Amino acid sequence: MRGIAYMKIIDITRELFSAEVFPGDPRPEANRIMSISNDAVCNLTSVSMCVHNATHIDAPFHFIDIGYGVDAIDLEKCYGKALVVECNDDSIDSGFITSKVPIGVKRLLVKGRATFTADGAEESVKRGMVLVGVENQSVAVAHDCQSAHKVLLESEVVILEGLKLDAVGEGEYTLCAFPLKMRDLDGSPCRAVLIQE
């Protein structure tokens, strides 16, 4: 039909209970409190989890003791044009950013298991990015989990971790990935989607 734009929504969120768990973090658990099958009026479930399980957003407080919590994140950073690029190396360093990411990109999602080095994070900040996302459960390289986190969070860059980008091609999309409103917490699960027009 003329005048109606085609729009496809791509879910890039990992299922909470089956997703990889970062070493040392608790696994999420669901507890059925009430059940219709046991003559209750409804089904009711409580969930116990780490706020960094599955697909989630890091707040500055995660690595900065005086940083703000996830409820204070600027939501405008979590919605808008985003570039998906693939990295076949182990790390996302400044060389990768300068060679693969055009100037002006504000939201960068990296496909693959790569994580950011400190200089890759610094180059992202220098370019004015407001959000970076990875498929790994941590944005930072394993041998130095603090540096990239601190560089990004001190500059109020939103960190989106645990994405599912295997079925997503490289290119530009509209990203929508909002944290839950939980006061002063260091992170939050989120439902992340890409909109392809």
Residue ranges and their predicted role:
Residues 2-197:
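Active-/binding-site microenvironments in catalytic and ligand-binding cores
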